[in-house]
Amino acid sequence: MSNPELEVYSVKEVAEILKTSRQQVRKMILAEELPAVKVGREWRMAAEHLQDFILNTIE
């Protein structure tokens, strides 16, 4: 079962989008401010969750 429309971002990509450091993104993930899942040794975030985070932050 796969969804070709499901887009995910790495910590590096999220950091670039949010204009912050990878370390800050990891801190936000561990503080459960950003929803993410760990795949192997790497964190991944669904594009939909990142969009929700951005929209909720600016409101």
Segments (PLM) and residue ranges:
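A detector for short, charged/polar N-terminal pre-domain segments
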Residues: M1-E7
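Residues within the helices of the helix-turn-helix
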Residues: V11-K12, V37
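A short, Lys/Arg-enriched interface patch at domain edges and termini
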Residues: M1, L50-E59
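Major-groove DNA-recognition helix of helix-turn-helix-type DNA-binding domains
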Residues: L18-R44
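The alpha-helix within a helix-turn-helix
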Residues: A15
